[in-house]
Amino acid sequence: MTKTEINKKDWEINVVVSSEKKLWKAKQDLALSNLAKTLKIKGFRPGKASVEAAKKHLNPEQIQEEAVKLIANDLVKIASESIDESYIVLDSPIYEVEKMSDAELDLKFSYPIYPEFKIKNYKSLKVTLSRAKVSKEDVDSEIEKIREKNALLIKKTKDQGKVAKTDTVNIDYVGKIDGEEFDGGKASSHELVIGSKSFIDNFEDQLIGFKSGDKVEVKVSFPDDYHSSKFAGKKAIFDVKINDVFTKEKPVKNDDLVKFLNNPKLKTLAEMENYFKDLIKNEKDEKSKASFKKDIFEKIMNENEIPVPRLILMKETTNAIREFEKDVKKYGFTVEKYLKMLNMNSKDFVTNLNKESELKLKEALIYTEISKLEKIEAQPEDYDVKYKKFAKLYNVSLDSVKSMITQQQAQVAIVNEKILEFLIKHNAIEKNSVGEEPKLSTTKKVVEPTEEKTRKDSKMSTKKPAAKPAAKPAAATKKPVKK
């Protein structure tokens, strides 16, 4: 027997299933048998206790709790079959015990469903979109990074020259405070880049003008906010010997520079410059697009009520917490230690993650609704354009792109990009980065977001929902017990 209730506050379907008495009894017997194998009872070998003996060492609640786990998959099938197909089920259900005794069991299964809502205002919202230009300086800066990265260190002889900015020096040094050496103040053959600011105060500047073989007395002061209070604000004197001086020899800015990019499609410096121009343009437009997207979605949310299913939000927040735990663990922290460093309590931490998760889900719902309202879908030719773009951008083969990005992943990105184009066309006030007056957008052109970023922005597919629920869940998750 089942009893179904639609909860439009939390957007879930609650189905209470009453188990057949015979099935419930059989599952309790099986649970007792399974538990008996885990017990160590005097007079029996481990795991070999009789059911009768085991029953004396277990309370009824233990047996019933184990039996619920065994029967849940049987009852969830009954619950799923009772759901009206007009509702779109978004995920597998969670379950909790409604009523339980030796003779009977009622389980309640809760399914998150797609909410019913309408976005009424998502046009003419007047949101600024900055159109950045790529300058010659931008391109030159990228070329210079390539030259810096591939520069050779050439040793200067004593007669060739003095220490200058950007030179690398090999030094021995001994530091003293009040005439006494201190921990960490001594090193041999240490390599230091002049101008890197890796040493305190103006230590590096005081070496400028000297040559290899010179001995220099360097006077510095530790900053008042130095991480070790033992040294904070103290004056120190370093006896420094300059062993060697190296200067950078950058590769010449010509066609030969292209080889350092390891891109067989680029042959000349001009091609390399155009490559960086396209890359920088894409990056700048990505930032502009991200800013526009943030502002337009914020306005749409302010203009419309976007309901988020409770269970989906709960799952999204739980996943976010797990991801955060994994991230801090990589750096040797626990969540507790990390939050202590931030002076944040766990309650505020979870609240913040919950808000972020809710925002992401609302964005996904907005994407989905606009795609339905405006009939925005991915066309077969869109996939070819998407794959070719990534192949060109990342200098990989078309087959490699197709193996990395599935058609479903590409579909979400394509539809979301089309929606963003639509929103720009109907809402953007374009502003040139050099300060031109804003003007209403008259073009559909928009820089495409990256695949990974778009997938993160939209956890729900923007494909038009089917007229019936998602595949019937085969398993249910037990609702966490409140402590």
From Swiss-Prot:
It is found in: Cytoplasm. Its EC number is 5.2.1.8. Keywords: Cell cycle, Cell division, Chaperone, Cytoplasm, Isomerase, Rotamase. One of its GO terms (cellular component) is cytoplasm. Residues 467-483 have a biased composition (Low complexity). The keyword Transport does not apply. Pfam families: FKBP_C (PF00254), Trigger_C (PF05698), Trigger_N (PF05697). Residues 435-460 have a biased composition (Basic and acidic residues). Residues 166-251 form the PPIase FKBP-type domain. GO terms for biological process: cell division; protein folding; protein transport. InterPro entries: PPIase_dom_sf (IPR046357), PPIase_FKBP_dom (IPR001179), Trig_fac (IPR005215), Trigger_fac_C (IPR008880), Trigger_fac_C_sf (IPR037041), Trigger_fac_ribosome-bd_bac (IPR008881), Trigger_fac_ribosome-bd_sf (IPR036611), Trigger_fact/SurA_dom_sf (IPR027304). It is an enzyme of class 5 (isomerase). Residues 435-483 are annotated as: Disordered. It catalyses: [protein]-peptidylproline (omega=180) = [protein]-peptidylproline (omega=0). It comes from the Bacteria. Involved in protein export. Acts as a chaperone by maintaining the newly synthesized protein in an open conformation. Functions as a peptidyl-prolyl cis-trans isomerase. Belongs to the FKBP-type PPIase family. Tig subfamily. Consists of 3 domains; the N-terminus binds the ribosome, the middle domain has PPIase activity, while the C-terminus has intrinsic chaperone activity on its own. This is Trigger factor. It comes from Mycoplasma mobile (strain ATCC 43663 / 163K / NCTC 11711) (Mesomycoplasma mobile). The lineage of its organism: Bacteria, Bacillati, Mycoplasmatota, Mycoplasmoidales, Metamycoplasmataceae.
